[in-house]
């Protein structure tokens, strides 16, 4: 069992909590007492960036509501409130359906905050949903925006799923079947990114945004990664671009300006020792041995030690 207690203005002191466990027949099968100490202090504003990927499609699927509907935005609002409450201040923002953790050739439910129209080969964009999303982040105290990845995972060869109304027909125009370095997507990014960044600046949130190309470029697809990065970078001048990167040699070559390093990377000591403007760290499902994580089967000290490590190594 995991039990959270809300102080709700209680005076500092020690409060006994008694927990009883009953079976389906209402027979008591266990009992424990816990003395909860409330100290006379509040945590200050978080001094680091903290993000967990926030998937709006999962909210829609789990609750059975139409994505981008009023009901969906109401739920997103509630989830954002909890997200912020747990100390998260940077949120994945799906300008297009995030191409994350998706089997090659398959799709996630469409979660696209930017409306795309193509008429006689010319693109135009609607940003009302994106503005509504950003307003909810402001309402809930989420300061920073992590713009969804511009290319697919595991090779960066393809485009994210993008839906558009083309000469009156609503359909998918990019996805696993379109090349990330192809002329069609180049043309699209050249039209889209200037419009997006202009809106972010007009709304006063540009300085709080981070952009992604794709995760973990490796030796095998490094040329493709660099080509795609160079497609986007001219339109993102002044914005910070960050990606998961665990090969220190690639950082030395300037492949990624703001690398996010796996906590079990063999090159982590090199990253920690480097003179970097920001030091980022991540863990996901593969960090199972020797490092911190928050798997439910782990003892809680393996989770809590992360705070000490972030402080010790001055992680951003």
Give the ranges of each region predicted by the language model.
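Short, hydrophobic beta-strand segments
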Residues: 1-9
